[in-house]
Design a protein with these regions (language model features):
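A short, N-terminal "cap"/entry segment at the start of jelly-roll beta-barrel domains
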Residues: 1-37, 42
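A generic "binding-loop/recognition-motif" signal
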Residues: 19, 57, 76, 92-93, ...
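Short histidine-centered beta-strand/loop micro-motifs
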Residues: 24-26, 47-56, 73, 97-99
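Conserved short histidine dyad/triad with adjacent acidic residue
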Residues: 36-56, 90
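Residue-level recognition of conserved beta-strand positions in structured domain cores
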Residues: 37, 66, 73-75, 98, ...
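Short, conserved beta-strand element in jelly-roll/cupin
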Residues: 39-40, 54-71
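Ligand-binding loop in jelly-roll beta-barrel domains
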Residues: 70, 90-111
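Short acidic-glycine-tyrosine-enriched beta hairpin
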Residues: 75-90
Length: 111
């Protein structure tokens, strides 16, 4: 059965260095996907700097909705702006930082 999740009902995750809302996940009725809306403040406004991380068993798809950023990964540095997509393979350490002057807004997908 199809399910609609209103913007205000997305679960807010307590993740360091960013505001993250889990729009779709197993907890919201999805079987095989997780979708997050992530907002990262400009570097000079951040109280906490995020560390690199990785996903052991899944790819991550990062789509830029607003702003400018750079993802620092094992395989290189990837500058990103509105409309860009980055596919991060399993086990690759990475972190995305805001390199612009306004909020960096990302839509992140995991299988």
């Amino acid at each position: 059965m199809a399910q609609k999740i209103k913007a205000g009902n997305a679960e807010r995750l307590l993740l360091p260095g960013r505001v993250s809302h889990q729009i779709a996940s197993a907890g919201a009725g999805a079987d095989n996907i997780c979708v997050r809306l992530v907002e990262i403040e400009p570097e000079h406004q951040q109280l906490f700097k995020r560390n690199r991380h990785y996903h052991p068993d899944v790819e991550e798809c990062i789509y830029v909705l607003e702003g400018e950023g750079c993802t620092y990964a094992d395989t290189g540095e990837y500058s990103m702006s509105v409309g860009d997509t980055l596919i991060m393979p399993p086990h690759e350490h990475h972190v995305t930082r805001n390199t612009g002057r306004s909020i960096l807004k990302l839509l992140c997908f995991f299988p």
